[in-house]
């Protein structure tokens, strides 16, 4: 049995939202899957928790994040292709604009105007930076736009990830960072969060990297050229969410489920999760391309991947961003675009290839347009295959709230539930 596991990023709204995207959007291709399907709701993490995307994605792929989550930094590093060693720490990072004299932050994301090419050039200027009088090293990779990942390594001493962020907009709480409503707009030097030599050393190395990066980047040719064009300089790097390698590597996806899996994802952290659990990473170029073109290629690659894999996981971007913007109409358009440009060609290609896979369709989290942020609400879940008796009709919150699957606590239960259902 082949399985297509399709996640609509942030497509769900809250059951209490006055209007719901999945109910009002015209999505005949998605809804056609409901003719042989069962449905329900799922808390991808747990009730009342507004999931972070990486935590939810790991859960959806069958791994309880409370047991297997290594931290955002390492997942970003895996996705960027950095081979971490025991004792390294990794942090997610982004280029920012600061006053180099006072370290006052002018823009945390360089006005979202930094191209990936510019970011790669700037990253090369700080990658391999020597720290601690040559005893330490910083590895830095640009990923997408203003985003990047930083790995700190010491030659002879282990580093601890128990350190605070240099990004003042996020406060470290346990393994996560939470966005602060108010903060002082200055680079915040890192501090150890425990009384431990490894944490003291890690914080010191992060601070050294952060300050040296401002000196190097402020006068970099890329930034001088941007300044001449009236654009903000990308002259600082803000870091958060430090993490180290887990004590034990998780069982691979094939070991866990007996399935050969592949993923088609866009974000570096999602790619990192795929590599972390041993999914084959199928790349689709997104930079400089229309969203509709990307969807069509993702559909084509998904069908190709089914020829050689048992399960293909596809994480589709689109609805989450207008949800954050509070745009109901934007979420409607995003879901309709997915239906027209991904699901329609996908179903055509499957028919032409004579393939009849099972479908799992859900969201990684709700991003209710009337809230403008991720919420702790459950999201709709549909499992579809020609062998399933019964029809659900429209795929939506209202229908799935009454569904046969009930409410599942934990996205990591979806794959076992699907396999059990398909086994009869």
Swiss-Prot record:
Superkingdom to which the source organism belongs: Archaea
Catalysis: reaction(s): (2R)-2-phosphoglycerate = (2R)-3-phosphoglycerate
Keyword annotations from UniProtKB, A to Z: Glycolysis, Isomerase
Positions of disulphide bridges: none
A Gene Ontology BP annotation from the UniProt entry: glycolytic process
Keyword DNA repair on entry: no
Pathway: Carbohydrate degradation; glycolysis; pyruvate from D-glyceraldehyde 3-phosphate: step 3/5
GO MF term set: metal ion binding; phosphoglycerate mutase activity
The keyword Repeat appears for this protein: no
E.C. numbers: 5.4.2.12
Family classification: Belongs to the BPG-independent phosphoglycerate mutase family. A-PGAM subfamily.
NCBIfam families per record: apgM
Function: Catalyzes the interconversion of 2-phosphoglycerate and 3-phosphoglycerate.
Record-linked PANTHER family: COFACTOR-INDEPENDENT PHOSPHOGLYCERATE MUTASE, METALLOENZYME DOMAIN-CONTAINING PROTEIN
Entry protein name: 2,3-bisphosphoglycerate-independent phosphoglycerate mutase
């Amino acid at each position: 049995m082949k399985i297509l596991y399709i996640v609509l990023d942030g497509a769900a709204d809250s059951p209490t939202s006055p209007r719901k995207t999945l109910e009002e959007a015209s999505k005949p291709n998605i809804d056609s899957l409901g003719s042989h399907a069962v449905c329900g709701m799922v808390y991808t993490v747990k009730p009342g928790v507004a999931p972070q995307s990486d935590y939810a994605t790991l859960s959806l792929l069958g791994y309880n994040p409370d047991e297997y989550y290594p931290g955002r930094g390492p997942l970003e590093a895996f996705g960027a292709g950095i081979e971490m060693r025991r004792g390294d720490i990794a942090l997610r990072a982004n280029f920012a604009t600061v006053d180099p004299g006072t370290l006052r932050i002018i823009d945390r994301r360089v006005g979202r105007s930094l191209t990936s090419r510019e970011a790669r050039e700037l990253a090369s200027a700080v990658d391999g930076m020597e720290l601690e009088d040559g005893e330490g090293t910083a590895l830095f990779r640009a990923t997408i736009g203003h985003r990047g990942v930083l790995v700190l390594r010491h030659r002879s001493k282990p580093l601890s990830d128990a350190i605070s962020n240099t990004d003042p907009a996020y406060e470290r709480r346990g393994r996560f960072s939470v966005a602060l409503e108010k903060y002082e707009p200055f680079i915040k030097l890192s501090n150890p969060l425990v009384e431990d030599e490894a944490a003291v050393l890690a914080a010191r190395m992060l601070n050294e990297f952060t300050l040296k990066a401002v000196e190097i980047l402020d006068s970099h040719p890329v930034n001088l050229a941007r300044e001449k064009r009236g654009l903000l300089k990308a002259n600082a790097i803000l870091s958060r969410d430090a993490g180290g390698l887990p004590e034990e590597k998780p069982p691979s996806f094939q070991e866990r489920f007996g399935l050969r899996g592949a993923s088609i994802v866009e974000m570096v952290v999602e790619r990192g999760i795929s590599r972390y659990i041993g999914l084959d990473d199928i790349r689709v170029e997104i930079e400089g391309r229309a969203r509709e073109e990307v969807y069509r290629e993702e559909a084509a690659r998904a069908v190709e991947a089914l020829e050689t894999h048992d399960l293909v996981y596809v994480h589709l971007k689109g609805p989450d961003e207008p949800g954050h913007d509070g745009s109901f109409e934007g979420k409607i358009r995003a879901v309709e675009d997915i239906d027209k440009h991904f699901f329609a060609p996908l179903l055509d290609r499957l028919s032409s290839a004579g393939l009849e896979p099972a479908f799992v369709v859900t969201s990684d989290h709700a991003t209710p347009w009337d809230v403008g942020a991720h919420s702790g609400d459950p999201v709709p879940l549909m499992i579809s295959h020609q062998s399933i008796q019964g029809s659900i009709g429209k795929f939506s919150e209202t229908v799935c709230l009454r569904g046969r699957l009930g409410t599942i606590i934990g996205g990591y239960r979806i794959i076992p539930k699907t396999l059990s259902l398909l086994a009869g």
